[in-house]
Amino acid sequence: MTLSDFIGALKDNPYFGAGFGLVGVGTALAVARKGAQVGMIFFRRHYMITLEVPSKDKSYHWLLSWITKHAKHTQHLSVETSYMQHESGKVHTQFDFHPSPGNHIIWYGRKWIRVERVREKQMMDLHTGTPWESVTFTALGRDRQTFFNILQEARELALKQEEGRTVMYTAMGAEWRPFGFPRRRRPLSSVVLESGVAERIVDDVKEFIGNPKWYTDRGIPYRRGYLLYGPPGCGKSSFITALAGELGYSICLMSLSDRSLSDDRLNHLLSVAPQQSIILLEDVDAAFVSRELLPTENPLAYQGMGRLTFSGLLNALDGVASSEARIVFMTTNFIERLDPALVRPGRVDLKQYVGHCSHWQLTQMFRRFYPQESAAEADHFSEQALAAHTDLSAAQVQGHFMLYKTDPAGAIKNIAEIKD
């Protein structure tokens, strides 16, 4: 049989024709599928825009709230429960619903936007125990302005929720995270210090904030340190909280006695503190004591703890690598226990004693709690209080007034009970 006869026989064979047809169809489908994939990749790269936001980014929680507001009709939700316990013991619980992990479609700016929330089950934040997440926005077109508008709107929504409130931050790992609910701003007038003390500190802070160019022109590091010292309960921390409210600043709380705090971590945290915030280091005497004291004079409660060294703290406050545009407040009950190197100018630029209540302070506090009473009654209360006790703290006086909220006469009559 010749070759031409063999080929002719194959053409006449129905089984061979059917098989060849199937191979052809399969090949065509495979080519079409690959072409569709390549075409989709080309289309997504050139005619679609994507924005990915990881959970560690500061805007992540802003965007979750924004998605919740715009994806009102989604039926796939996750809940975030928060509660706050009042001093009376009553617990207020709040449930916040967010779109669950998965795909959601949102109509925004006259276009459809696909929102994909992904939760990584294999990875989690070691400090909070929460899984790592990300949110990806996908939209048609090549205009980035849509995503800028979304981020700006999410930011404004978050700031509106914090408007008129003081946000507290605490150090979690290598970053600052909000601590609890934003608090209502405390009026500066609600903290009564000795005459002229509050004004001196407020004027100094405002002068520092308003003159960054003065520091730059003279080559002076743009940072400011304050030390408030005095007996406990006299209003040091309360004044700092009220000052933050007056300035519209947040507060970053840091404990130097934290065993996980190292030199590098402290330096990093001070460098990445939120803008327009006050860094508060409370009771610095509890972490470090003066090197001039004898070892026998150092109780265990005041020995250095953790991995943070004294030199590391000094370098973080004003070393070569220390950050600028920073306001640091330190408080202590025992200034004599602090090392002179810690409180020298450059690390502490202004030291202020906040002591027991004077006659003027007692008068002002009485008039604030009982505005309907005369100045003579307020003066009489102050004289009686100082005659009974010469070392009254603001916390003790306020606690006494709380027992006689509507009874100023009782507050004066029972002044002897103020320390009981």
Curated annotation (Swiss-Prot):
Top-level taxonomy: Eukaryota, Metazoa, Chordata, Craniata, Vertebrata
Transmembrane parts of this sequence: 16-32
Keyword terms: ATP-binding, Chaperone, Hydrolase, Membrane, Mitochondrion, Mitochondrion inner membrane, Nucleotide-binding, Transmembrane, Transmembrane helix
Residues in compartment: Mitochondrial matrix: 33-420
Entry's localization field: Mitochondrion inner membrane
SUPFAM superfamilies, alphabetized: P-loop containing nucleoside triphosphate hydrolases
GO function terms (MF aspect): ATP binding; ATP hydrolysis activity
Membrane side Mitochondrial intermembrane: residue ranges: 1-15
Membrane topology: Single-pass membrane protein
Keyword Lipoprotein attached: no
An example Gene Ontology biological process: protein insertion into mitochondrial inner membrane from matrix
UniProt name for this protein: Mitochondrial chaperone BCS1
Enzyme class: hydrolase
Family stated for the protein in its record: Belongs to the AAA ATPase family. BCS1 subfamily.
Record bears the keyword Cytoplasm: no
GO cellular component assignments: mitochondrial inner membrane
